[in-house]
């Protein structure tokens, strides 16, 4: 297997099976595999070190924060998501945190971006970025592909950090940025595999196998793309008539995913993501999400649905 442990060729065969190789050297697509594979650069999974590398005030729990509000989260999290992350607005809330594996850092205000970079020997070869429309801490309504102007602004922000700390790295690098600061780094793709760009995915395979970057943007390169999430109340397991749902929406989207209930633990405490929907048109992902919400069992609490872009209550 080339792609490990998540295989986009098998997950999205309608997009990639005929164009993207599925053999050759290992290409990490999940954090636990990347941690083992990229031993020299895996320090970036230490979120405390990433914060310190930018000169931020931060420290291990239970050291006292220098300001509030702060975000408290695990120093390491190879599961993904917002597991065990929380916001503390004052010392009373912070004092209730008893977790030796966590650290605190400032709560950043501003736009939240997920940036996918392709690096060759530490040099940025390509970049795609997405802006998240927040619902509440750790949860998002939808993500949208940024335009070139926004990409240029983000590149100016992150490029000095990449040049200083990613020297010699070849592969995918996902950075999460809020405002002017990098909050997380992952040695893998973020969401670019969902774009449906087979030439891009083939180029990533070629980069890992032949150590050269061949991708050139063209008229097929997506300029608009949306990923809509569906969240629901915690402490419940949700299910759906998958065959019926796929019959209704399967051919209308680039990709969708009904999340595995066994992975709900990676979500923030106030809610679990139960599905995502991906397409070049926002109306399409909103339509599919509304249908999914109506078909989910048990019913999703209305407080998770009413704030969503384009939400309409359906009876199915």
Language-model segment annotations:
Residues 1-52, 282-316:
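ATP-binding N-terminal substructure of ATP-dependent carboxylate-amine bond-forming enzymes
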Residues 22-24, 55, 209-214:
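Short loop/turn hinge sites at secondary-structure boundaries
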Residues 29-161, 316:
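Active-site nucleotide/adenylate-binding loops and adjacent lid/helix of ATP-dependent enzymes
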Residues 107-111, 166-171:
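A short catalytic or substrate-binding loop motif that flags glycine-/basic-rich loops and adjacent residues
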Residues 113-119, 175-177, 265:
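Broad, structure-driven detector of short, well-ordered beta-strand segments within folded domains
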Residues 117-167, 179-227:
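ATP-dependent carboxylate/phosphate-activation module, predominantly the ATP-grasp catalytic core
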Residues 206-316:
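Peripheral (often C-terminal) accessory segments that flank ATP-dependent C-N-forming ligase machineries
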């Amino acid at each position: 297997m080339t792609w490990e442990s998540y295989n986009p060729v098998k997950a999205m065969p309608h997009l990639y099976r005929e164009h993207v190789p599925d053999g050759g050297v290992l290409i990490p697509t999940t954090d636990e595999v990347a941690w083992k594979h990229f031993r020299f650069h895996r320090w970036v999974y230490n979120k405390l070190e990433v914060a310190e590398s930018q000169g931020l005030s931060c420290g291990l729990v239970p050291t006292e924060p220098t300001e509030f509000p702060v975000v408290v989260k695990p120093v390491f999290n190879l599961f993904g998501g917002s597991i065990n992350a929380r916001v503390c607005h004052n010392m009373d809330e912070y004092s209730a945190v008893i977790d030796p594996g966590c650290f605190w850092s400032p709560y950043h205000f501003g736009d939240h971006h997920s940036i996918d970079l392709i690096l060759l020997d530490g040099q940025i070869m390509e970049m795609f970025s997405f802006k998240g429309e927040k619902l509440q801490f750790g949860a998002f309504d939808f993500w949208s592909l940024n335009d070139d102007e926004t990409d240029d602004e983000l590149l100016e922000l992150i490029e000095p950090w990449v040049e200083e700390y990613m020297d010699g790295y070849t592969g995918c690098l996902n950075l999460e940025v809020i405002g002017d600061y990098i909050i997380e780094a992952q040695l893998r793709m973020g969401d670019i595999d969902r774009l449906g760009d087979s030439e891009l995915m083939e180029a990533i395979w070629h980069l890992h196998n032949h150590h050269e970057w061949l991708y050139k943007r063209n008229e097929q390169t997506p300029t608009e793309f949306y990923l809509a999430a569906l969240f629901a109340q915690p402490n419940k397991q949700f299910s759906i008539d998958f065959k019926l749902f796929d019959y209704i929406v399967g051919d209308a989207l680039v990709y969708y995913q009904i999340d595995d209930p066994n992975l709900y633990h990676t979500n923030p405490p106030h809610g679990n993501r139960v599905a995502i929907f991906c397409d070049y048109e926002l109306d399409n992902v909103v339509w599919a999400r509304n249908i999914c919400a109506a078909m989910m069992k048990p019913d999703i609490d209305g407080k998770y649905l009413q704030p969503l872009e384009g939400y309409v209550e359906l009876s199915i």
